[in-house]
Each structure stands twice: as C-alpha cells, then as structure tokens.
Amino acid sequence: MTVRIAINGFGRIGRNVVRALYESGRRAEITVVAINELADAAGMAHLLKYDTSHGRFAWEVRHEREQLFVGDDVIRILHERTLADLPWRELGVDVVLDCTGVYGNREHGEAHIAAGAKKVLFSHPGSNDLDATVVFGVNQNQLRAEHRIVSNASCTTNCIIPVIKLLDDAYGIESGTVTTIHSAMNDQQVIDAYHSDLRRTRAASQSIIPVDTKLAAGITRIFPQFNDRFEAIAVRVPTINVTAIDLSVTVKKTVKASEVNQLLQKAAQGAFHGIVDYTESPLVSIDFNHDPHSAIVDGTQTRVSGAHLIKTLVWCDNEWGFANRMLDTTLAMAAVGFRLDASASTKL
C-alpha cells in the first residue's frame, strides 16, 4: 500500500521531507498529494529546487498555477489558514505531516482528523494529550492503530535518546546533563531587532546565543524513569545547519572510555544501524551536513571520569536526519493500520 500524505507547512522540515522522500527512493511507499503553505507557489518551487544547506535538488521542479511538479509527479498546492477547511477527505489523505512548528496539541490534531485525515504526525514536540511521541529506532514498535495524533519529538530528542538508551541499558544511568550546540534558526535575527527573548534580539551571525530548551522534558517524555534526573541547556551558534550535543551521564557500573566506544560502535553497526552512526575521523560540523542518521557519535571525544561519569559528543543534521525520521515514523504509523471509529484508547 502506498501511503498518501499531505504536508502542512513547507518550511525547512517540510521541504526536506519532500527532498528526503525522493532522494531515498521511497516514492513507491509514500506519495505526497498536497502541500498547504501560505507562501506563493513560485516561492515554494524555488526553495525546493535551491537550498543553501543541501544544494540543488536533483529532480526537476516547476509549478503551474496551484500545482507543484516534481519530476512527473503532481502535488496540489493549498493556501488554507483554517485547519478544519483543508480538503484532506477529498484528497484521500492517510497521514498529515504537520511541519508548521506552530500547531502541536490535540485540538490541532483533531482539526486535521475532522478535515478527513486518518492520522497526524507533528514535526515537533507536542502537548501531553497526544496519543504518542515517537523516537524512531527506540519506541516506534509500541505504536498501535488507535494512535492517530502523534509527535515525532524534536531533532535533538531524536539525536540523544538512542544514545541514552544504549548507555542506560549497558551501565544504568543515575543522572545526566545535556548541552545542545545548535545551529541558528529562523526565530533569530539577521541584525539586531526586537524579540520577546532579549538574547534573540541579537544578530545570529555574530554571537553564541543561549536559548531555552525543553530537551530534558523530551527525554522524560520517552523515559519517564528519568524525571528530575536530567537537565539541559542550549546555545545557538553562527552556522546554518548541523548540531552537536554534549551528553554527560553518571552511571551505576564502572566503565572505561574504550568500552563506551565499543558499545556505541557495535550498536551503530547492528541494532541501531541507520539510526546511529559512529566515527573516529577528525571531522567538523559541516561534514555531517546531509547525513540521514539521527545521531553520529564522535568516538574521539568520549571521556570517562572517576569510572562512573561518561561524556560523549553526538552530532546530527538537525534538518536532514529529522526529515528522514518523519518518513520512517509515517510508514510505521501506516503499518499498524488505521482505526477510524475512535480516538486512542491507550497512550504511548
């Protein structure tokens, strides 16, 4: 069965989802039938074709009126502001990928369902009343047909959760701290300008800027046993893509850095292949641009202090890796089937 998807919001993640779909050769599994975006069709086509981070799209892209052509495929373009008025029923949409970054609670998800979609996947952390939050590679096997409104968590949650799971399963994590070193985002300023967050009033290209993060909450959403045992901070740096995460955990068992690296490398080659990668090459952030993994462990930076404190550095392409996980989770949601008569009876 080919899953019919619609994309709501054609920004960084929405466009990368389309690019990843075509570049990964999954068009036999997923078809994009519509994109809802307030911008005009000419701008949508141009930004899909030309991308500063990811280069020129290999597929032919053009638009005619309210249709976007990617190769021989035709995608309907919509400019609807009201979710309930979207024509998902008419278009036979199976899953809406809501990539706006604006919507994320159950009411928003139910609006997509009322418009005719069978399921909804948010490209960002959602409210607690959603049916499930999925980090693909860790908990997607717990999805059920009744999970209709789902969050794909965040790019940083997808990056760090697999590594936390591996370390916890092997050594038993007592507590941890996380520092996210994140590329600049579109909620920052090109030059100094007003923003409700005074730090984000400053030019993104000229400073390392501390910002708030809910990553600790994202960790406990997936692993409730770590409630009040993880803290996180984040800074934005003057690059346009790729993120590094500094993870420090205190563990119950004694361990050596070489053992940690052996564990993570084995996982990258085995159970977490395609989700986690491992490198000991002397690489920098640009080298991970367009990498489809959720997490790339930099084994050269692993440290152990006092036999119980582990520090690791984990990279991710916060756009491309996450866009690929959106596709993975979409297929996982479709694989368990569609239950149309009721909302979820059990939460994940």
Swiss-Prot record:
Metabolic or biological pathway: Cofactor biosynthesis; pyridoxine 5'-phosphate biosynthesis; pyridoxine 5'-phosphate from D-erythrose 4-phosphate: step 1/5
UniProt-listed InterPro entries: E4P_DH_bac, GlycerAld/Erythrose_P_DH, GlycerAld_3-P_DH_AS, GlycerAld_3-P_DH_cat, GlycerAld_3-P_DH_NAD(P)-bd, Glyceraldehyde-3-P_DH_1, NAD(P)-bd_dom_sf
Entry EC number(s): 1.2.1.72
One cellular component term from this protein's GO annotations in UniProt: cytoplasm
Transmembrane segments: none
GO molecular function: erythrose-4-phosphate dehydrogenase activity; NAD binding; NADP binding
Residue numbers marked as site, Activates thiol group during catalysis: 182
GO process terms (BP): glucose metabolic process; pyridoxal phosphate biosynthetic process; pyridoxine biosynthetic process
Cellular location(s): Cytoplasm
Residues forming the catalytic site: 155
Residues annotated as binding NAD(+): 12-13, 81, 318
Binding site for substrate: 154-156, 200, 213-214, 236
Keywords on record: Cytoplasm, NAD, Oxidoreductase, Pyridoxine biosynthesis
Catalytic activity: D-erythrose 4-phosphate + NAD(+) + H2O = 4-phospho-D-erythronate + NADH + 2 H(+)
Assembly mode: Homotetramer.
Family annotation (HAMAP family): E4P_dehydrog
Task of the protein: Catalyzes the NAD-dependent conversion of D-erythrose 4-phosphate to 4-phosphoerythronate.
Family: Belongs to the glyceraldehyde-3-phosphate dehydrogenase family. Epd subfamily.
Protein name per UniProt: D-erythrose-4-phosphate dehydrogenase
Protein species of origin: Salmonella paratyphi B (strain ATCC BAA-1250 / SPB7)
Gene: epd
